[in-house]
Swiss-Prot record:
It comes from Arthroderma benhamiae (strain ATCC MYA-4681 / CBS 112371). SUPFAM superfamilies: RmlC-like cupins. It comes from the Eukaryota. The active site is at 378 (proton donor). Its main location: secreted. Residues 73-236, 270-414 form the Cupin type-1 domain. Mn(2+) 1 binds at residues 116, 118, 122, 161. GO terms for biological process: oxalate metabolic process. Gene3D superfamilies: Jelly Rolls (2.60.120.10). This is Oxalate decarboxylase ARB_02208. Keywords: Decarboxylase, Glycoprotein, Lyase, Manganese, Metal-binding, Secreted, Signal. GO terms for molecular function: metal ion binding; oxalate decarboxylase activity. NCBIfam families: bicupin_oxalic.
Length: 425
């Protein structure tokens, strides 16, 4: 059964996705071989077209039941405020993501992400507009820095921080080193010996602590004593309304303090100009790495910013240190994940998608577009970016052993490159 490329392009255009001809019928469970049949019941045509690897484009090498490893921010509930919005991907959205949760935070000009802190570390990547970052350490050191597209911040667990939008529209990818970011923690009363009584009488608390909420729940006479001010209703307008974003005007004030500003290895911010693009040996794109080697404070989240040329392949590899959490910024991708036990599954990704590859699972990522670069971020709950290349491993193993292991002629192994290619054109 043959179907013209014009049909492929037409139906893909309806869904707003890149056209790639996998054969069969686009958007239908009919493969090139003739296997399958049309959908006769309810279905979502746009989702079907965006995920050909589930239907007509499903590789024959996909075997077994592999859990869903993909989420789209477009499926997340958006919390809207005067001054911006937030939408998250947490473990209830993507249960396979144990290490990292993510969010998109949008601020209008002057919009402030409320002063707060977390019981986990927060990492952020600016991809639209620019922001002012404000932070204070337990030692009274402070930081005020302007971040523009590509720049990164990292706030350790418990660090006091906030940020404000500077341009008309500003947006940040935020990640936390805890997949179950919104989980409720418990403080157990010590006077119950029975665990059921402890659970029923536990005090719950969440991951984020907000300054305005804390002040609103503190007696005013205590606030007056703490801040050395009069008790004349100063904090009457401080509300416990959990506003994560508030509207304001762009800050023009500077700050000085006796313990000085955060600088050097202690800085909470990183400017992407300090991580030049690496032109990889494979010639298929570039990689920028930001981890504790060049951003020392970022001890629990490491990042690689990857750009693949049209048709390029992020080579077959795995990561020895952690799960890989992904955010796709632009373009269209295809990836097959091998999770051992003979199980593998292929996924399609587009801009705004997140994904996770299980700890040490083998995989590749391919740019399926013919004319658009693929740009995505790899994040790890680790202090460094690390991967093991399958091709390099085979090339650096005695060639007769490697050839026997995968049952290929030895000259196939002889031709493999001994340096890591990263991205292959």
């Amino acid at each position: 059964m043959k179907f013209g490329s014009a049909l492929v392009a037409a139906v893909a255009a309806v869904a707003g996705v890149a056209a790639k001809d996998y054969g069969g019928v686009p958007g239908q469970p009919i493969q090139k071989s003739g296997k399958g049949a049309v959908f006769s019941g309810a279905t979502n045509p746009q989702l079907d077209l965006q995920n050909p690897s589930n239907i007509n484009g499903q590789p024959a090498t996909d075997i077994g039941l592999v859990p869903n490893l993909k989420w789209s921010f477009s499926l997340s509930k958006t919390r809207m405020f005067h001054g911006g919005w937030i939408r998250e991907q947490v473990i209830s959205d993507l249960p396979a993501s144990h290490d990292i949760a993510g969010a998109q935070v949008h601020l209008t000009k002057g919009g402030i992400r409320q002063m707060h802190w977390h019981r986990v570390a927060e990492w952020g990547y600016v991809y639209a507009g620019s922001i002012l970052v404000f932070a204070v350490t337990e030692d009274g050191q402070y930081q005020i820095d302007k971040l523009t597209p590509g720049d990164i911040y990292y706030f350790p667990k418990g660090a006091a921080h906030s940020f404000q939008g500077i341009e008309d529209e500003n947006e940040v990818l935020v990640a936390f080193d805890e997949g179950d970011f919104d989980k409720i923690g418990y403080l157990f009363p010590p006077y119950y010996s029975n665990i059921n009584l402890q659970l029923s009488n536990a005090f719950n608390y969440r991951t984020t602590f907000q300054v305005a909420e804390w002040i609103a729940h503190t007696p005013q006479d205590v606030l007056a004593k703490n801040f050395n001010i009069s008790t004349g209703g100063t904090f009457d307008k401080t509300k416990s309304n959990m506003l994560e974003i508030i509207n304001s005007t762009t800050s023009t004030h500077n700050v000085t303090g006796p313990n000085g500003a955060l600088m050097g290895n202690s800085s909470y911010t990183f400017h992407i100009r300090d991580a030049p693009e690496i032109q990889v040996p494979g010639g298929g794109g570039t990689i920028q790495i930001v981890d504790s080697k060049n951003f020392p404070i970022s001890k629990t989240i490491a990042c690689a910013i990857v750009r693949l040329k049209p048709g390029a392949l992020r080579e077959l590899h795995w990561h020895p240190t952690a799960e890989e959490w992904l955010y796709f910024h632009s373009g269209n991708a295809r990836a097959t994940v091998y999770v051992s036990g003979g199980l593998s599954r292929t996924f399609d990704f587009t801009a705004g998608d997140t994904g996770v590859f299980p700890d040490n699972a083998g995989h590749y990522i391919e740019n399926v577009s013919e004319d658009e670069d693929l740009v995505y971020l790899e994040l790890y709950k680790a202090d460094r970016v690390a991967d093991v290349s399958l091709s390099q491993w085979l090339a650096l193993t005695p060639h007769d052993i490697a050839a026997a292991a995968i049952n290929v002629p030895i000259d196939v192994i002889d031709k493999l490159k001994k340096d890591k290619q990263y991205i292959i054109q």
